[in-house]
């Protein structure tokens, strides 16, 4: 996708737009009915001028509440696993694992946000925004000022399927996620949400 198209799409996504009435309903349906979820994703990180900093891709899955697995395949291999109590960040290239309590990580990764159950209305101020093409957008602004992201937008299909996420951090960097090969409520085995550090890696705990 060209830089011009990034600018057009993301500038529209991050501007205030008229209020509509169906995105919050889509979110509530997604939270209440999508108890498990898996998809592939493409991720693009852009600076405040919409210059591409980095692209990545991989797969993700979650099981509510608080269990998720987020795997980066390209351009580097990284794994994030939430087991319901802790979140494990494994960087294969660095041979390092960082461990956080789940409640500390809920605002720091898209995976933790999506797997967080029905607390999103408690933790975020929600605003419905306009339909853009086939996507209905919802804006979520964290109530906790220590959240890693200042603004999050969720894009749903008209049938209530999560298709995209746009996240802006305190440095005005934007992370754009597009999901594909989506399955809602697949059967996921418990071992997917368990992690044992490989031998020889450094383990850093909060």
Curated annotation (Swiss-Prot):
Monomer. This is Outer-membrane lipoprotein carrier protein. Residues 1-21 form the signal peptide. The gene is lolA. It holds the Pfam family LolA. One of its GO terms (cellular component) is outer membrane-bounded periplasmic space. GO terms for biological process: lipoprotein localization to outer membrane; lipoprotein transport. It comes from the Bacteria. Its main location: periplasm. InterPro entries: LolA/LolB/LppX, OM_lipoprot_carrier_LolA-like, OM_lipoprot_carrier_LolA_Pbac. Gene3D superfamilies: Lipoprotein localisation LolA/LolB/LppX. Participates in the translocation of lipoproteins from the inner membrane to the outer membrane. Only forms a complex with a lipoprotein if the residue after the N-terminal Cys is not an aspartate (The Asp acts as a targeting signal to indicate that the lipoprotein should stay in the inner membrane). It is found in: Periplasm. Keywords: Chaperone, Periplasm, Protein transport, Signal, Transport. It comes from Nitrosomonas europaea (strain ATCC 19718 / CIP 103999 / KCTC 2705 / NBRC 14298). Belongs to the LolA family. SUPFAM superfamilies: Prokaryotic lipoproteins and lipoprotein localization factors.
């Amino acid at each position: 996708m060209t830089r011009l198209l990034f600018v057009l799409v993301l500038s529209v996504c991050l501007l205030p737009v008229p209020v509509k009435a169906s995105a919050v309903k889509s979110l509530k349906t997604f939270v209440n009915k999508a108890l498990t979820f898996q998809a592939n994703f493409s991720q693009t990180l852009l600076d405040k001028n919409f210059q591409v900093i980095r692209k990545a891709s991989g797969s993700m899955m979650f099981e509510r509440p608080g269990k998720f697995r987020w795997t980066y395949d390209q351009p580097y291999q990284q794994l994030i696993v939430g087991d319901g109590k802790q979140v494990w960040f494994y960087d294969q290239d660095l041979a390092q694992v960082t461990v956080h309590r789940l409640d500390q990580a809920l605002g720091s990764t898209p995976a933790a946000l999506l797997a967080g159950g029905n607390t999103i209305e408690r933790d975020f101020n929600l605003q419905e925004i306009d339909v853009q093409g086939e996507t209905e957008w919802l804006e979520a602004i964290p109530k906790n000022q220590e959240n890693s992201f200042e603004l999050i937008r969720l894009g749903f299909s008209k049938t209530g399927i999560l298709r995209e996420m746009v996240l802006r951090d305190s440095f005005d960097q934007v992370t754009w996620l597009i999901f594909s090969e989506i399955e809602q409520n697949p059967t996921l085995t418990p071992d997917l949400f368990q992690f044992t550090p490989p031998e020889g890696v450094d383990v850093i705990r909060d």
